[in-house]
Amino acid sequence: MGKDEGIPVRVALRCRPLVPKENNEGCKMCLTFVPGEQQVIVGTEKSFTYDYVFDPSAEQEEVYNSAVAPLIKGLFKGYNATVLAYGQTGSGKTYSMGGAYTHNQENEPTVGVIPRTVIALFREIHQRPEWEFNLKVSYLEIYNEEILDLLYAARDKTNTISIREDPKEGIKICGLTERDVKTALDTLSCLEQGNSSRTVASTAMNSQSSRSHAIFTISIEQRKEGDKNNSFRSKLHLVDLAGSERQKKTKAEGDRLKEGISINRGLLCLGNVISALGDESKKGGFVPYRDSKLTRLLQDSLGGNSHTLMIACVSPADSNMEETLNTLRYADRARKIKNKPIVNTDPQAAELQRLKLQVQELQVLLLQAHGGTLPVLNSMEPSENLQSLMERNKNLEKENGKLSRELGEAAVQTAQFLEKIIMTEQQNEKLGSKMEELKQHAACKVNLQRLVETLEDQELKDNVEVIQNLQQVIVQLQDESSGIAGSIEAMDEEAASFPVPEEDSGEKRSSDGFTTNHALRQAQLSKELIELNKALVMKEALAKKMAQNDRQLEPIQSEYLNNIKHLESEVGVLQKEKEELILALHSAKKDNNQAKLSERRRKRLQELEGQMTELKKKLGEQSKLLKLRESTEKTVAKMNQEIQGMKMQRVQLMRQMKEDAEKFRTWKQQKTKEVIQLKEKDRKRQYELLKLERDFQKQANVLRRKTEEAASANKRLKEALQRQKEAMEKRKDSQSKGMEGAASRVKNWLANEVEVLVSTEEAQRHLNDLLEDRKILAQDIAQLKQKTDAGERIPTKIRRRTYTVAELENLEEEASVTKQIESLETEMELRSAQIADLQQKLLDADGEEEMVKRRWETISNIMEAKCALKYLITELVSSKVAGSKLESSVKQNRAHVADLQKNIFEERNQMAEMETEHQSQLMQLEQHHQEKILYLLSQLQQKQASVPVTIEELPAEEITEREKQLMERLKFQDEEIEKMKALCEKNQQLLQENDMYKQKLALLHVASGKKLHNILPAAEICSPDSPFDFIPPKPRGKRRTNAKSAAVILEDLLSESESEEESDDKNWEPGNNSKQSKKLTSKCSCKARCGNKMCGCRKTKQNCSDDCFCDPSKCRNRDNHMDEGKHEDQSLESENSKIDYPDVTAGGSFFTPPCVTPTKKVLREISDIGQVLSIKLQRKPSTASASASVMESQENQTSILTKKKKVLCNSNTSFFSGCSAITEDE
């Protein structure tokens, strides 16, 4: 038994709670559930309504009892059923369906739909002992568009499975394993076996993600024990679909990516099928079931023979809002699908039942055909028989038509007469009732004759006589009405006795069906009306007679009542007398003398009993008469009700006859009008025929004038062509004008649409960035909370935003862990609010599906479509040109940056080579210089030791030769110094060029907004020939050190502002000595030991001199204290000379190889010795004290130089030792 109307697919929405991962990422709920309503709201405005809605607090049992349990009862009635779960990956489909069931979960509340369905199915089977059941189960999965048997023993072997379509049984799967099951335990073991074989893998969104679609099918065959023909077949499909996923969220690669593509392809085909079935405009159109194996297997479940329930599983997290919205729309379209389930009976039993019905129908037809034979006239030949029958048929049709018309007219007349009769009867009834009222009036009961005799006033006598005359008139009218009623009754009896002729069934056919039917119907209604009138008259007469009898019984009834009372009193008296006689008889039995008296009393008693019996009989008869009257009254009341009903029925019949007559009149008028129109058409055709004949006669004349008309026709043709050309030009002008207006309108519309779509995409990109930022914030908060719980001290984390150094220092000093967590949570709430606002705007921009569908309805004709296409092509070409320009400019910029970088590398390499060469030259010069100084010192000591005389005592030749030698040496030293200055200046120029290139590179980085590694390949950034690691500069708020290139300037080396305690200056940098040269004239006046920076000389990094006002014996900033602090100075030099330079690695810096460079103090002392010697040569001392002081100073300087030489020789550090790379904070 099929159902005429389709049953919609039911949809249940289930929302899972937020998982810990989503909580850790700071996700918020984006779904709102309306209490008491099956409705869910996405964001703030967009709402969806489904058959069932389950919020995150709903348990498995509630979902099953509300949505799935009603389908189980239909299975035992022969209907198929399907339950399928759809949703995003990780939304709870497998959990809801029980796709991961094991025997350990048997009694747990988390058991899904499939195990609960199996248990309920077998529970229902046990409650039907009069039926025999045969159950089979199968379990398959669709993995990468291949059907795999999950119950097949050896899944490694190829098991050929194909899909076939049976027109009677629907979709069948050939080669699939089906197992017979007897109990729920057997079925659940098959389910567990299939679950263990199902393909499952881990993704970034779900650790146990189903990678295939799974279908668990239970086939049920039920047959009644006593009736083999009463059997049903049904199937239950339990479908666990794989979740839709996005690669950027699942991070799928390799096989997982291929699986995800296959899953999305199958779900896309399923969505196309749902859209085709749910779209009312495409109803009856093509449905792409064959695009996927999943849709072919679900062909009966979607739009076919099945009761279907779809469980849409969604995630409430706002990070998955787009997927959730797609799922809700998907489910909303599924609600529009109409299935047509039918009862699946046994084919043999159904065929047998169909044949039985067919036999019954044939038997009825056979009876209607009078045994299946028609009368045939055997006395005539077949041709004569047919001809006579045709003639007879025509005659009968004519006669039938005539009789039908007459019958119709008679019926109309009868209806009119009956209507008049009814009205007359109504008036008669009214008059009769008034006559009865007058008759019952008190004036009619007065004896007027006696009253006339007694009255004396003549006027009163006249009035009484008038009243007496009126009484006589009333009596006469009553007699006349009774006579008319009697004659009417006699006429009715005669009409009833008149025989009604039987109708010939063979002559009922008429030529005009509608007229005949109308006449017959009017005749039938008239007949019914006449019969109704007869019955009504009879009943009215009977009711009147019964009423008269009742009125006649009224005095008898009163008399009977009085008699009954009298008899009852007599019976009472006799009863008392009887009781007294009985008592007297009992007393007489005791006395023998009163025998005669007792005998008389006994006789009297018998007489009394006889009288009492007669009185009781009379009393009973009179009671029966009273009951008879009561029953007569009830009968009269009932008859009156029937009379009223018959009158109403008569009125309805009259009304119906009037309506039929009016319809027939309207139809007849219409037909008459049509006949008139046809006659008019026929007349016109006759006229046209005559006209054509006249035209034909005129053709000869037309042929004669043919030559003359050729020229005029040619002229008219030219004129027509000219007019046509002008019309075409006008039409083109109007079209061009219209096209321009349409073009501007379409252009503006398309520009607006493109702007909206671009804004939507940008908003989506910003939304993804905000979600990622919130995820990072949630991770930071979780880490801080974990460390807080563990009791660790958390260092202040520097966020990715840019702070100044002072702000960072204040933040490190003042911020605490609690404040950090609170600030992060506030920032995360701000991100969540921005996310919700963006999502709502995206929802508003997206709009309903109908708005998306109506997007192109603005283009209504081909002209607008051409305008739109032209505009889109123009925009596409312009965008392509702009893109190519940008690409070419980017390529040029990259090439330019590469050239600049290459030049920088070359310059750096060249600078490094020059630096190494310069260092080597400096070292060689220093060695030569030291050798010369040592040679001079040795010569000076030897001379002093060998010749203990003064200079004045030396011969002039010797002094001259020595002076010449010293002058030559001084000249040589000056030349070397000039060379060193030139080299230093060249080095300084190279350093300035290097700084300029660095600034250019930094500007390029800021302009491009990209890192160097994104612009140039790695091979260009790090050249194998480069002896150092280049770190690209980044914009910084403030640097700890102003690291400059290590340039050695000769003026600084030779300045006299350096002291032996220069290692104490922690802020010393190369090239800063020019600032210190301004402080040479400072003097101190300390009263202590000059041991701290309160001393002016120590503060300016100078030794105290003789000009200072401090105590020489206590001062520790003089030369005599330097030997004591030698080792301390070395350690201070090695520690405090480290500044924030880039880290120096072996083979990776231009600061290699290490070299020993003299300090400024040594060079200064060397220059002092040269100055002393030059003074000696230029000026000869005049006194011995002067020569003694000079010799003493020479000895002191010699001892100091010897000490410094030992320090330099023992030191393993270079001038640039301790330099480290400047680490740039991210």
Curated annotation (Swiss-Prot):
Keyword flag Metal-binding: yes
One of the GO BP terms on file: mitotic spindle organization
Q: Which cofactor does it need?
A: [2Fe-2S] cluster; [4Fe-4S] cluster
Q: Which PROSITE patterns match?
A: KINESIN_MOTOR_1 (PS00411), KINESIN_MOTOR_2 (PS50067)
- Give expression by tissue: Expressed in oocytes, eggs, testes and brain.
Q: What spans are recorded as compositionally biased (Basic and acidic residues)?
A: 722-735
The protein's matches in Gene3D superfamilies, at most eight in alphabetical order, are given as:
Kinesin motor domain
Cellular component aspect of the GO annotation: chromosome; cytoplasm; microtubule; microtubule associated complex; nucleus
Extract the coiled-coil ranges from the record: 351-1006
Q: What's this protein's family per the entry?
A: Belongs to the TRAFAC class myosin-kinesin ATPase superfamily. Kinesin family. Chromokinesin subfamily.
Q: What does this protein do?
A: Iron-sulfur (Fe-S) cluster binding motor protein that has a role in chromosome segregation during mitosis. Required for mitotic chromosomal positioning and bipolar spindle stabilization.
Q: What is the name listed in the Swiss-Prot or TrEMBL entry for this protein?
A: Chromosome-associated kinesin KIF4
Species of the source: Xenopus laevis
- Source gene? kif4
